[in-house]
């Protein structure tokens, strides 16, 4: 045998012997055969309300459109997979998310009820107005019914009957079934005499200064809302959330002072994976102000407090934004989109765009919401301000798409039924369109 071959043989023998001798010192296997985590322990006591500053709306859009887009590009960060998943790449239950339709079959009645806990305030008039908010054409009153339950009353903008109130109800039910924490909402019909102003009711002027709410303020506000010929007013009543409001959750980082909030929000699967369901319902108005963190008391232990995370304000879904603004690009381009402007300039406006074929169906209660131009993978919100969606990858989108595909026609129909649309054709159109958009989501997997 050649010397080289002899050396190799002896080396192999030595390695084998060494491996056998050290077998007893090898570390244990890293992965154990045990159940995947299904519930996150994020309800540990937070003795006092956490801090955190919610940015002004102008500041927020400046950050999203300009500063963070530039700084994020300069950071040259590699793509990072989402956190907050278990060994099966699924999202456990937490203060952010609760698995519902993704893990069990919900009955149509469950979807129709959504987040209902105390029930509709209809039949519990008069409503005592405690405060009002009026921003532009958006009108809202915080009022209590005769049970003492407090609701935010929101209305349809004059000239757009049933669209915004129906969208709030339908999308809220679908998002609740998907797994998100949302407020309890109901459609209520009332009359002007059902609204009573409390002696200490307040409002704010254009400069944000608080003052007493007057009858004149209420009359002026109601002139901007849709009122039926018989004097009835259609209202979306959203029950005020329990606890102390902390403002919306930031799109990046964590909330200061909340020890349970450990994962950067931009890397949470339940936030990044919302892309398919938001595209499905055309949830364009994504911003920090349309989420709300609440410092709550544990129902089973009054000495324990923690933060619950909610999404809210879905009235601009289901094509309302495109309908109200007359901007057919909504969902296909940002409201301010230099790239889209440049493309139009270079092509001299001659290139056909998919959104040019969009039309409202001409049905009461339905906005510009269709399936034939819907691109699930190309849909974008109104502004590039919500970081989790901007960073969503194919794994996040696949996770969300799987849950969207769990909805049956009967469950979707139950969500639409809760909106109490007066035209049966409108309800049928919305169900058909949501099913068609769902199938498009299935075809792309995102």
Predicted regions and their residues:
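Conserved kinase catalytic-core segment
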Residues: 163-168, 249-340, 344-348
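Sec/Tat-exported extracytoplasmic proteins
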Residues: 145-147, 178-179, 278, 438-445
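Bacterial N-terminal signal peptides that target proteins for export
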Residues: 1-9
